[in-house]
Amino acid sequence: MVLALAELLALALWFSASAVIPQLTAAWDLSSAQQSWMTMSVQLGFVVGALFSALLNIADRISNRYLIAVSASIGALLNGAVPVFDAGPDLTLALRFGTGFMLAGVYPPGMKLVATWCKEDRGLGIGILVGAITLGSAMPHLLNAVPLFGDQGIPAWQTVLLTTSGMAFLSALLVGIFVQVGPHLSKTAPFDWRFIGRTLSHRPTRLANFGYLGHMWELYAMWAWTPFLLLASYEAAGWSTQGARLAGFGVVGIGMVGSVVAGLLADRMGRTVITSWSLGISGGCALVVGLFFDHPGLLTALCLIWGIAVVADSAQFSTAVTELTDSRYVGTALTLQTSMGFLLTLLTIRMIPPLVDWVGWEGGFIVLAIGPVFGVISMLRLRGLPEAAQMASGKR
């Protein structure tokens, strides 16, 4: 669908700077903290933007088509300003924050738009969208592995950032021209700042959000640092670093398969079942992945399995919220959910580098398994509630 393609293109902005951290470090002599903040600043900007949108019910009061198109365009400008003005570390972090803020107007509204087109197959629909977002998030790693316009096979960081900005501009055009609202759109909601409080106090929605938080504890730290785990492993074994970059793209991008398959299965078997299995598999991978550091081939295979499982459940937490919450405020509920999840990622993304310095790559990811355990407990508790019958046409 056109919307999925547009989200894929726009979300290439997310890791555009993170993918080229080695080149930026060589150019600007980045510290370890600055390297982490190249990703964390986007997360923080997204959180602030999502909370702003949730408080004002923006996703339920403004045309989502135009919200996505305008947000993607401004995000592209902010991202492109980094190479155009050779911004340096401090200004780049500010521009990355702004990019994240604008992506809050792309991701949650996109899920709401899909929900207007889907009912019985909503899990699959949102799964396809999140799969496209996953592949889009991986695109900078692919661009960074393509030896075009580069020195000794390494592309200039400016090329990667400018290309992703161009992709986001194309996304805005696609949404503005081709995307339409579906037949299941609820009436425009009146402004109600108290809706956030009602959502947080509604136990079924709260448990779905708890499951999402367990998932997010793991996801973005895995996406941010697994490519560098692979790079370190490949270098230690004398393998091609370009191969490591391609593997990094594959590990993130393959999550698209997990999202689509999990969406298809969740509509037939239930959201709580599929999310629990996905969390269990990904948590297990987090526990053992470091043990394969000295075997890059096996490490790559395990990381690909992890890449499928770690994001397979993501769309189903969001779908559950659309089924459990007041239909007039679906956009606000999704924005609130994502803001809480991305706020949590700030902790785990920043946590991995010092853990790796302390225990090495072999044990640096074990802490990520805490999230899946918490998530499984939350989803099993949700499954036991009567309201769970509202999900997946009664399949819970």
Feature annotation, model-predicted:
Residues 50-88, 266:
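Conserved MFS/SLC helix-loop-helix module at the cytosolic interface between two early adjacent transmembrane helices
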Residues 266-317:
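C-terminal transmembrane helical hairpin of 12-TM major facilitator-type secondary transporters
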Residues 105-118, 312-326:
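Intracellular juxtamembrane helix-capping segments at the cytosolic ends
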Residues 17-18, 204-256, 318, 348-349:
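Extracytoplasmic gate region of multi-pass secondary transporters
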Residues 78, 90-105, 297-312:
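Hydrophobic core of transmembrane alpha-helices in multi-pass small-molecule transporters
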Residues 181-210, 396:
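Juxtamembrane intracellular "pre-TM" segments in multi-pass secondary transporters
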Residues 95-131:
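Cytoplasmic helix-loop-helix junction between adjacent transmembrane helices
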Residues 120, 128-179:
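Helix-loop-helix hairpin linking two adjacent transmembrane segments in secondary transporters
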